[in-house]
Amino acid sequence: AVQLLEVNPEIAQNS
């Protein structure tokens, strides 16, 4: 699940 979040640009921006 975390991997998918990293792939998403929106979530990646949150990191």
UniProtKB/Swiss-Prot annotation:
It comes from the Eukaryota. Expressed by the venom gland. Keywords: Neurotoxin, Secreted, Toxin. The keyword Secreted applies. GO terms for cellular component: extracellular region. Its main location: secreted. It is found in: Secreted. GO terms for molecular function: toxin activity. The keyword Metal-binding does not apply. Transmembrane segments: none annotated. Coiled coil: none annotated. This is Scolopendra 10564.33 Da toxin.
